[in-house]
């Protein structure tokens, strides 16, 4: 809507092939990493704490009020959260996203996902990668995919991003006793890579 209404600055590639690739990536982001990031957000982001404090009756009442999220809320234990397998499954989806982003940066030459221009592809996936870094799970890409760290650093310093992520908007600022920021959950990312023989490239 915003892209169509405010045409002064376009965030869609001019080249039709590149634009098609961007659209395919937008569908991918909606279907895979967007739902997947909920798991670590609830488990490590302080969001689980409010459920732990609830009675079972109140928790079930909350579920009834949010029918679109019923399946998600019933997928974890309100007192302990998600299983390690569920958490690792979410990591696999995020890592698949990282791998795809890395390939796009290589294919289109960077510095942005679709090439020289910042597009809807960057805008769509930035909140997911920023959230994972804020949770302390940036170990998923820091070593195996340094291109993502460079991309994220650049994207986070755009004026529009700085306005969007105002002071107090990140989970590490809302729940500082729980969420410690970049690198703080390295034991989880290290364990994940150990389980999968330290070869993130094989998890596609």
Annotate each predicted stretch with a short phrase.
Residues 1-67, 107, 113, 182-185, ...:
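GST-like domain detector, emphasizing the conserved glutathione-binding G-site
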Residues 144-204:
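Long, positively charged, glycine-interspersed low-complexity recognition regions
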Residues 31-153, 157:
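GST-like fold's C-terminal all-alpha helical module
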Residues 3, 13, 20-22, 90, ...:
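Small-side-chain structural scaffolding
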């Amino acid at each position: 809507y915003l892209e169509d209404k405010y045409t002064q600055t376009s965030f869609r590639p001019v080249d039709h092939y590149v634009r098609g690739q961007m659209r395919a990536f937008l569908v991918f982001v909606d279907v895979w990493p967007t739902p997947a990031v909920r798991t670590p957000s609830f488990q490590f982001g302080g969001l689980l704490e409010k459920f732990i404090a609830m009675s079972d009756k109140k928790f079930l009442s909350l579920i009834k009020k949010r029918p679109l999220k019923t399946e998600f809320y019933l997928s974890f234990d309100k007192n302990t959260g998600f299983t390690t397998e569920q958490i690792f499954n979410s990591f696999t989806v995020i890592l698949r996203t990282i791998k795809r982003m890395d390939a796009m940066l290589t294919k289109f030459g960077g510095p942005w996902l679709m090439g020289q221009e910042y597009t809807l592809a960057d805008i769509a996936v930035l909140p997911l990668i920023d959230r994972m870094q804020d949770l302390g799970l940036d170990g998923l890409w820091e070593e195996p995919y340094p291109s993502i760290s460079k991309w994220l650093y650049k994207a986070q310093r755009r004026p529009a991003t700085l306005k969007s992520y105002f002071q107090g908007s990140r989970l590490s600022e809302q729940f500082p006793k729980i969420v410690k920021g970049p690198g703080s959950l390295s034991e989880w990312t290290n364990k994940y890579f150990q389980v999968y023989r330290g070869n993130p490239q094989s998890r596609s």
